[in-house]
């Protein structure tokens, strides 16, 4: 069974994971003409 502690850990992990995916997706699909030095 999943208790409150596991549920909080899963929610926190998913939040961080999805946030990281969004950041990575933004940097990959950002304006290709822009080159960061």
Swiss-Prot record:
State which ranges are Cytoplasmic (membrane side). Answer: 29-37
CC annotations in GO? endoplasmic reticulum membrane
Among SUPFAM superfamilies, the record links this protein to:
Oligosaccharyltransferase subunit ost4p (SSF103464)
Sorted alphabetically, the keyword list is:
Endoplasmic reticulum, Membrane, Signal-anchor, Transmembrane, Transmembrane helix
Specify the signal sequence span. Answer: none
**Taxonomic superkingdom:** Eukaryota
Q: Which InterPro entries match?
A: Oligosaccaryltransferase, OST4_plant, Ost4p_sf
Membrane-spanning ranges: 8-28
Q: Where is this protein found?
A: Endoplasmic reticulum membrane
Q: What is its main location?
A: endoplasmic reticulum
The record gives the membrane topology as: Single-pass type III membrane protein
Lumenal side: which ranges?
A: 1-7
Query: Which proteins does it associate with, and in what oligomeric form?
Result: Component of the oligosaccharyltransferase (OST) complex.
Family to which the UniProt record says this protein belongs: Belongs to the OST4 family.
Record function comment: Subunit of the oligosaccharyl transferase (OST) complex that catalyzes the initial transfer of a defined glycan (Glc(3)Man(9)GlcNAc(2) in eukaryotes) from the lipid carrier dolichol-pyrophosphate to an asparagine residue within an Asn-X-Ser/Thr consensus motif in nascent polypeptide chains, the first step in protein N-glycosylation. N-glycosylation occurs cotranslationally and the complex associates with the Sec61 complex at the channel-forming translocon complex that mediates protein translocation across the endoplasmic reticulum (ER). All subunits are required for a maximal enzyme activity.
- Can you name this protein? Dolichyl-diphosphooligosaccharide--protein glycosyltransferase subunit 4A
Q: Which organism is it from?
A: Arabidopsis thaliana
């Amino acid at each position: 069974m999943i208790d409150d502690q596991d549920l909080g850990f899963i929610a926190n992990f998913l939040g961080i994971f999805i946030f990281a995916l969004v950041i990575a997706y933004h940097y990959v699909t950002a304006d290709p003409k822009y080159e960061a030095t």
